[in-house]
Amino acid sequence: MITPYDSGGLLLSYKCNSRCRHCLYGCSPRWRKWLSITDAHKIIDGLRRVSDVSGRGIHLAGGEPFLDFPRLLAIQRIAVEHCVRVAYVETNAGWCVDEDDTREKFELLKDAGLDAVLISSSPYHAEFIPVKRVVMAIKVALEVFGPEGVLIWVSKFLRQLVSIDTQEVILFDRYVKTVGMSEARHSINTAYQLIGGGRAGANLGEFFHKSPPEAFFDNNCQMELFRSGHAHFDPWGHLIPSMCAGISLGDARDLPKLVKELDITKMPVVQTLAEEGMVGLYRLARRDFDYEPEPDGYMDKCHLCVSIRKHIAQRTRKFKELAPVEYYEQI
């Protein structure tokens, strides 16, 4: 049922030095759990056995993976040991306060086989991280990895933020006021490729056209759940299909077994999304859990989906696929 993966991401933790208003994974400083070294071995080996990630590779992310640098470095080495390419490590550069320390960490990762880093820059991150740290991280990364080894996500936002303030954090309202509502709406709609899952729909919906639930009733979610070729793996070992944070298809610490024996009849939410799509999940939530649609509507089907799933998760824990349960407390 699951199309073999050609790429994937390991979430070393949901723990982050920020609590960004757009975050798909509900990351914040409140999370505690980290992916164990043992489980990293199992997941990466499983990916190698059931997928072909030799081309696009995997990425290491969070949360903020540099908050536990020894673990990050160890997992980079594990990937090399299993002949699985790490395409890049993601970072928000919040930890980059000392240039020598930043260079040392980047050099250790490069020596361990890492080819690239992805450095985030956006008005969501800038509420927590001064732009000067991002600028310094980019400078050092270019020296260590070269221009082909530095991905800036997103350059347009970085240019805007540098023109506002590099020394202090930039509150979101200040960003919008400075660039103007029209430009802010255009940039937020086009620059970051946001989807409405996680916190984005609830916190940034005013910048998007919204529609009633019925607008998202046409299609099922089989592509996202089973056929995207991409997945994420969190510190509990949950297999997160595509970008569907808060949904687990099972325990990825034995990925060959999971892929072979996947039984969605034991996961009613997943089965409903796969067979009926949003219309089925919406009717289930209305019928069994008194879900009321949000009066202003939804920016996309992922916004509707996570709104319903959060409502259900707050009322029952009988759906094991709504995991980790802490996710629904953090978004």
Range-by-range predicted roles:
Residues 67-228:
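Conserved AdoMet/S-adenosylmethionine-binding subsite of the radical SAM
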Residues 20, 69, 128, 241-243:
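Activation segment
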Residues 1-31, 243, 303-308, 312-315, ...:
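N-terminal pre-core extensions flanking Radical SAM catalytic domains
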Residues 17, 65, 124, 157-159, ...:
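Short, solvent-exposed loop/turn segments at secondary-structure junctions
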Residues 1-91, 96-104:
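Conserved alpha-helical substructure of the radical SAM core
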Residues 185-310:
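Accessory C-terminal segments flanking Radical SAM cores
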Residues 34, 128, 292, 296:
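Charge-dense, low-complexity intrinsically disordered segments
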